[in-house]
UniProtKB/Swiss-Prot annotation:
The lineage of its organism: Bacteria, Pseudomonadati, Thermodesulfobacteriota, Syntrophia, Syntrophales. It is found in: Cytoplasm. PROSITE patterns: S4. Catalyzes the attachment of tyrosine to tRNA(Tyr) in a two-step reaction: tyrosine is first activated by ATP to form Tyr-AMP and then transferred to the acceptor end of tRNA(Tyr). Residues 361-427 form the S4 RNA-binding domain. This is Tyrosine--tRNA ligase. Pfam families: SYY_C-terminal, tRNA-synt_1b. It catalyses: tRNA(Tyr) + L-tyrosine + ATP = L-tyrosyl-tRNA(Tyr) + AMP + diphosphate + H(+). L-tyrosine binds at residues 36, 169, 173. GO terms for molecular function: ATP binding; RNA binding; tyrosine-tRNA ligase activity.
Length: 428
């Protein structure tokens, strides 16, 4: 039984950009239904840019619906032109299958696949078996080339070149929706706003072939307050795989959220009650930093688990100083409200031998080697500008030696870049 209409949850939390028919969608969601969202297996891990659709699938499942994560193993062989100014590099089947396997493990962290409450399906299972002539006759005849060329996903590519393989993408995505409708009783698709044209094509195809009504809903394309694409940093993508982005780095991404985005991100990327999230509007600077810590903790907990979130919070508190979280601020959060151990094990670290440190390592070299700076020249500039620190003390010369004399009581050396990026040196 559905206790609350998930459409209202989506509206309240800012998930919805466009919808085929608001009244019809809300009515459809009054009873359990199946809804799918597509994911490209173009990398071994999903990244933060995939979190909005993942959170939507979780909300759907929590409200009694069947969430379908459709992995585009078939469509990835072609490449989606939506939102792209250039043709994507075509991956091998082996690489796509490996990525899809990794994605299944990731989805299992967010969704329960027991009793088909959620499904992960690969469209390669049917797309790679299609007969081209039959597909053109049965599916292609329902598509107007004029309408296809008017779609935003194609219009932006026409001047730079759109090849025939990519031109077929809309047909294949529409066919995915039809296939899921026919075989899994899936009546709704959700996705990024750049997919709107493809999603409407699927709704129209179901109407033409089956004479039935299907629904589509899009998410807003998120950027940060600085205009940066969601999930991008100077190091690249922020991954959901802890081997690619550690829980500590993941936590740090969220805690560095811009002030204007805190409330929006709490609504989208946590399950905290909205009446608590609304508190953010009236917070001062100090309290807003507490809200960022809660956002970072809750987001890390959802992706990496409570233990990893606690370790990341604790390491951050050790590195930056304890900031007591007011007990009245978003009390549903399980973030610690002041308890602290001195465990900084979640902070990224490198190991150096005693002999290396005894001889001394130039500061600019070790700042580059540990990954705080992308090059030695960047490290030299950073130190010259006063942005390099060892054990919270400024590094005054780029060739200042980091030695065993810098080891603290725990036998470690703490390096810092700017205000927020740390690295630990451990002796092996």
């Amino acid at each position: 039984m559905i206790l609350k209409n998930v459409y209202d949850v989506f509206m309240e939390r800012g998930f919805i950009e466009q919808v085929t028919d608001e009244n019809a969608v809300r009515k459809a969601l009054e009873a359990p239904l199946a809804c799918y969202i597509g994911f490209d297996p173009t990398a071994r891990s999903l990244h933060i840019g995939s979190l909005v659709p993942i959170m939507a699938l979780i909300h759907l499942q929590r409200h009694g619906h069947t969430s379908i994560a459709l992995v585009g193993g078939g469509t990835a062989l072609i490449g989606d032109p939506s939102g792209k100014t250039e043709m994507r590099q075509i991956l091998t089947r082996e690489k796509i299958e490996l990525n899809a396997t990794c994605m299944r493990r990731q989805f299992a962290r967010y969704l329960s696949f027991e009793d088909k409450k959620a499904m992960m399906i690969n469209n390669a299972d049917w797309l790679t078996k299609l007969n081209y002539i039959s597909f053109l006759r049965d599916i292609g005849r329902h598509f107007s080339v004029n309408k296809m060329l008017a779609a935003e996903s194609y219009k932006m590519r026409l001047e730079k070149g759109l090849n025939f393989i990519e031109f077929n993408y809309m047909l294949l995505q529409a066919y995915d929706f039809l296939y899921l409708f026919q075989n899994h009783n899936c009546v709704m698709q959700m996705g990024g706003n750049d997919q709107w044209g493809n999603m409407l094509a699927g709704v129209d195809l179901i109407r033409r072939v089956e004479g039935k009504v299907a629904h589509s809903m899009t998410f807003p394309l998120l950027t940060t307050a600085t205009g940066q694409k969601m999930g991008k940093t100077e190091k690249g993508a922020v991954w959901l795989d802890r081997e690619l982005t550690s829980p500590y780095e993941y936590y740090q991404y969220w805690i560095n959220t811009g002030d204007i985005d805190v409330g929006k991100f709490l609504a989208l990327f946590t399950f905290l009650p909205m009446e608590e999230i609304h508190q953010v509007k009236s917070l001062s600077d100090k309290e807003l930093n507490m809200a960022k810590a809660i956002l970072a903790f809750e987001a890390t907990k959802i992706t990496h688990g409570e233990d990893a979130a606690l370790a990341a919070w604790n390491a951050s508190a050790v590195a930056f100083g304890v900031k007591l979280i007011d007990t009245s601020l978003m009390p549903s959060s399980t973030i610690p409200r002041g308890q602290l151990s001195q465990d900084a094990s979640a902070i990224p670290f490198i190991k150096k031998s005693w002999n290396e440190l005894a001889k001394g390592i130039p500061a600019y070299e070790i700042m580059h080697e540990c990954g705080l700076c992308s090059s030695k020249s960047e490290a030299r500039r950073l130190i010259a500008q006063g942005g390099g620190y060892v054990n919270e003390n400024p590094i005054f010369a780029f060739d200042e030696l980091i030695t065993t004399e810098h080891l603290d009581r725990s036998g470690q050396i703490k390096l810092r870049k700017g205000k927020k990026k740390y690295m630990i040196i451990k002796v092996e």
